[in-house]
Amino acid sequence: MSVLTFLKPRGSSSVARERLQLILAHERAERSETGRPDLIITLREEILNVIAKHVTVERDKVQIKLERGEGVSTLGVDIEFPVDAISKAKPKAKRAIA
Amino acid sequence: MSVLTFLKPRGSSSVARERLQLILAHERAERSETGRPDLIITLREEILNVIAKHVTVERDKVQIKLERGEGVSTLGVDIEFPVDAISKAKPKAKRAIA
């Protein structure tokens, strides 16, 4: 998945729509155990759940690409949504990584 | 933040270390309300919390870049970690976006 094709700017037609794009790349070590669950797949659901808490997402406006290469797994998510789809509430999140 | 410089491949020196890189770009609509909290900042903490649930992260191995441009806000996260830092448990996550 070429990063650039994924993050290509949108046409200016949809003025009242916004776009969220996410790329998650996991570069694995040579001797990482093959049996271990793929980190990207583990993270994908929970990250999508975080996004869905803050943005009302229409299923057909979500593109998800997952690629597992030689030493790298890559997840690409592209979500388009109307301006008012973002929830106003400012949630308080405990910080795990400072 | 140029996507390419962020996702540049690591040197092959650290064979037993892995790397997780995330880029989150939010393309805002021209008339989105200025008073609204920045979506990227809202999502940043919760996504980092999701990652920290599955990877034991050393604080000094986490790089976070946040850029707010004309119509786009971009978050870049780069985490390096040892092979055994990934938790083995395979959590069951409810799916919000299919």
UniProtKB/Swiss-Prot annotation, chains A, B:
Keywords: Cell cycle, Cell division. InterPro entries: MinE (IPR005527), MinE_sf (IPR036707). GO terms for biological process: cell division; regulation of division septum assembly. The keyword Transit peptide does not apply. Signal peptide: none annotated. The keyword Cell cycle applies. It comes from the Bacteria. Prevents the cell division inhibition by proteins MinC and MinD at internal division sites while permitting inhibition at polar sites. This ensures cell division at the proper site by restricting the formation of a division septum at the midpoint of the long axis of the cell. NCBIfam families: minE, PRK00296.1. HAMAP family: MinE (MF_00262). Belongs to the MinE family. This is Cell division topological specificity factor. It comes from Methylorubrum populi (strain ATCC BAA-705 / NCIMB 13946 / BJ001) (Methylobacterium populi).
